[in-house]
From Swiss-Prot:
The keyword Secreted applies. It comes from Cryptophis nigrescens. Residues 31-81 form the BPTI/Kunitz inhibitor domain. The record marks K41, G42 as: Reactive bond for trypsin. GO terms for molecular function: serine-type endopeptidase inhibitor activity. This is Kunitz-type serine protease inhibitor nigrescinin-6. It is found in: Secreted.
């Protein structure tokens, strides 16, 4: 196979990896943690994975503490936790 063909194959495999949803067996354990706004009084838009609804949802993060099920963007949440 030519080097151009190998690069195309590598590019397609990389794209497939990025676009393929995370399966529940690959999902990190922290995706099962509940929404936790933390103990501070900030008002920051954040996203968490709701394991009952199997989707990423918005919540208000206080800015400190909380847990690892806390993402700045819905895209980051989906790439990490959504199946």
């Amino acid at each position: 196979m030519s080097s151009g063909g190998l690069l195309l194959l590598l590019g397609l495999l990389t794209l497939w990896e990025v676009l393929t949803p995370v399966s529940s067996t690959d999902r990190p354990d922290f995706c099962e943690l509940p929404e936790d706004s933390g103990s501070c009084k900030g008002n920051f838009e954040a996203f968490y994975y709701n394991s009952d609804q199997h989707q990423c949802l918005e919540f208000i993060y206080g800015g400190c503490d909380g847990n690892a099920n806390n993402f700045k963007t819905i895209e980051e949440c989906k790439l990490t936790c959504a199946a």
